[in-house]
């Protein structure tokens, strides 16, 4: 079966033919590639084509596809059982592994997705502060729970619908939206609203494209939250163990009240978490009145994969230096080639994360990102795919370097960029 036929058949039985909207390739005027398997830095579609994969399952695969250590850990766990709905030693082991490197985090709760993590973190913040409103930033995506699907990035931005039908006005009215990297917009909202339970932010935004928050902005944001008895939530579902081993904390050293984790923490399996100091976490049920639960939360396969992934990342002390150098080589190479061709391009990388925008102006917030030439991006994406390079099919997503990549792969990619730019 070909990709084209597979998508046509999928559309008969699956809403939109995909189980997450951006996978449909609708905004790049193409059909999705149906993947048969992956190995290292590569994925292979059912038509027999191979691609250098810079999506890496949208970030979780720090060590690429079919990493032997993670596979071995999963196989060992599966041999004992896939799920029990009861505590296992693996949960405590992964909890200790995560918390050991964050001095301000004392307890953690595992869930199955980033959406669950951010949704639960906000409920926890509201329960702890006894306040109702939350403040988020335009273009930041924190999953698809109702209160957070307001002025969102990621797939919502890709389909030009940063909010969603079905989100009730009575829910959305409690969500305040500030401008990313603009502290004055935050101050204005705090002046007008005295019941803000929490501020949630991607400290390294990856869902409007890659846009890091500025150090002074984050420092001032933390001060404002502290002065107003408002909890600061860092959504590190994407940037955790990607921007550095300690995520944004390893770069900006700002201690958020709550951190959400995901993607890499599950090693490619469904796992996420939220963590905070004990006085906050202890109001979660069964100790306190904030309810949160999940049938597959902390399931042994995901815990085993997470332990293998984080243990390997922690041991390989030079891993993040290598990934950062490759991301830098890729983005600087793209910028040089664009300049030679006279194409408008802004590039960025943080650790193993990278982004690029087809615009002549620097990008520091969502409105800047929206100035990108989407038609140009679509042509570029199609050309790159034809040249064997698999990039996220959206201008508003982040790319990822994995440990199985090297200089040769980056050189191959840059040659594809050169050829793609020639055809634009």
From Swiss-Prot:
Gene3D superfamilies: Aspartate Aminotransferase, domain 1, Type I PLP-dependent aspartate aminotransferase-like (Major domain)
Catalytic activity of the protein: (S)-4-amino-5-oxopentanoate = 5-aminolevulinate
EC number(s) on file: 5.4.3.8
GO BP term, pick one: protoporphyrinogen IX biosynthetic process
UniProt subcellular location: Cytoplasm
GO CC annotations, alphabetized: cytoplasm
Keywords: Cytoplasm, Isomerase, Porphyrin biosynthesis, Pyridoxal phosphate
Molecular function (Gene Ontology), one example: pyridoxal phosphate binding
Required cofactor(s): pyridoxal 5'-phosphate
Enzyme class: isomerase
Family annotation (PANTHER family): GLUTAMATE-1-SEMIALDEHYDE 2,1-AMINOMUTASE, GLUTAMATE-1-SEMIALDEHYDE 2,1-AMINOMUTASE 1, CHLOROPLASTIC-RELATED
HAMAP family documented for this protein: HemL_aminotrans_3
Family: Belongs to the class-III pyridoxal-phosphate-dependent aminotransferase family. HemL subfamily.
Quaternary state and interactors: Homodimer.
Protein's name according to its UniProt entry: Glutamate-1-semialdehyde 2,1-aminomutase
Source organism of the structure: Campylobacter jejuni (strain RM1221)
Gene: hemL
